[in-house]
Structures are given as C-alpha cells and as structure tokens.
Amino acid sequence: MKSNCVGCLLLFLAAALIPFTALAKERVLVLTDMSNEPDDEESMVRFLVYANEYDVEGLVATTSTWLRERPREDLIRRQLDAYGLVRDNLVKHAGGYPTMEQLLAVAATGQPTYGMAGVGEGKSSAGSRRLLAAADKPDARPLWISIWGGANTLAQALHDARRERSPEELHKLIAKLKVYTISDQDDAGRWLRLEFPDLFYIVSPSTTGHQEYHRATWTGISGDRHYRNGPMVDFELVDNPWLEANIIRNHGPLGALYPRLAYIMEGDTPSFLGLIDNGLGWAASPAYGGWGGRYVRYQSYAETHPIWTDSSDNRDTLMVDGKAHTSSQATIWRWRRHYQ
C-alpha cells in the first residue's frame, strides 16, 4: 500500500511538471452597421474590453436595413482611439490585449451600398478583401464572422472567392468560416444560405424589418422590456441607471463612448459573447448553450437546408418567482448576472 501511494505521488509530481498550454483563442472578424442606433456602439465597447479573449482579425463598417449607405469606419476608429487611452490600465488586470495600432490595422469599410445591390463583379471592398485575407491565413482555427448589421460584405467576399478559386479551394474556405448574424438585416443573408449550403450559419431568420425580432434568441441579452418576451430577471443590470453608474460615468474615455440605451442594451453582443472562454464550451457547439445562447441545427421553414437556429428544442426553462419560464431568450438572460 505504501509503495502504491509513493507511485501515485510521483505520477502527480510528474504531471505537475508538464508545461501548461493555454487554450487557443477564437479568431473573430466583426461586421458592424455602427451609427444607426446606440447598441452597436455599446457592443463595440464591450468587444474591446474583452479584446484579450480572442484574436481580432477585422473590424469592418457595413450597411444594413437601418443604415443603407455611408458605413461609418470613422466611428470604429474613434472607439479604437479611446481603447488606446485605456489599454495600459486593461493590461494591469489581464494580459493579451492587442495594441491600438494592431486593431487600427484591421479596421476597414465594407460594401457602401445596401444588400445584394452592393454585391457583384468589380464591387469588392476593403472589408471584403480583409475578410478573405483573414480566412486565407495558414491557421487551422475557424474564423468567426460576427455580423451586427447587413451581411453583404461577406456575400461579396464569397462571390469573389467562387469566381476566382477552384471548387476545392472554395470548399476549404467555406469550411473555415463560422457565421453568427443578428437576424437578417439585409437580403444578403438569405442569398448566402441559398448559394453556400455548407456554410456554418447561426441566425434567427427574419424579414429585413424588426417585426420578428421578438422571437429571436439574441434578444435575451436585454430585450425583455422592449420586445416583451422575458420576465425581467436581473433587468436592472441592463438598464440605463446601472449602465451609467458602472460604465458610462467616471469610467474613462472608452466608457464615455458607451451611449445610453434607446431600445435594448447591446443587441449585437450575443454574436461574440460565446467566444469568451468561460468554461461553458459554447464555441465548440451552439447546442451546448452559454452566453451566446443555445441553437439547434435543423431545416426551418423556407430554408433549403439545415442551419443553426431557433426551435422548440433550443429553449431553456427556469423558475422565476415560483413560475416556470420557457423560451429561447432564457438561454441568454439566465447568464445576465454573470456577463454583467
């Protein structure tokens, strides 16, 4: 018995000497229609505060149904300037933050026109080229495309890739991409799903208006009051008084760029929140659930093939004040006290 204990101790000590290898960060490229309403600017502040948690491959200004022309790369750069002022403070708390210069180098503007009218021969943009350059890196990790507005910059990138590459090369490119889009904010998302059925795509399909947003999983971030689709659990954490006290006022130049909410707080944040390595493993499969919500892969109505989306099987049930609440939004709001 004594020798067995000694053997166990030696094995434990040997294991302790093995170098610890940190988990690889997820790669992410953001497409944002910043300026049309406050929540994109709110989400960008959070994205930058967590910039040490992933490898940022691009920050691309785009159009959407709410911003049909003049993508605002200048607003991205304004937030990056503020990030540069606070980075020294951020690195006191955690390592891995990119420099302001590194982030400025991957900022770009996508398609200047709304939807599929901006996609076609000779319409490539700095944003679509940045996306392809990131995807073409000799890196085995997937490239997450976090779409906060319209999807036509991704559509242009894949339009160009299909025209210029062999079917085998295109297949390899598609296999590297993982898309999470905040509903359908132009007609390019539908086109992408029709033309590239193998593309990994998370979406709560919708018209290009807001009429179906109340059903979308992503509204669980803070949409309880505006969309009337949640029991307001810990809602004070996502409302203006808390945001002003804990982010906006007296929290430095980056916090000062966080606007008061007008509709919901950070509606675009679910598209990247699950990429933070918090132990829930969401990036491995959206079916696991986590800060980015829970999704299932199936062929919903009007889709031509399975996508990652909402269904009766992606809902969580939680008890609130003695009552059961079941919804897809619950897969996000259940974590509200943790992500705030």
Predicted region positions:
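Bacterial N-terminal signal peptides that target proteins for export
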Residues: 1-10
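Hydrophobic alpha-helical transmembrane segments of integral membrane proteins
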Residues: 15-16
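N-terminal acidic, glycine/proline-rich low-complexity segments
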Residues: 23-340
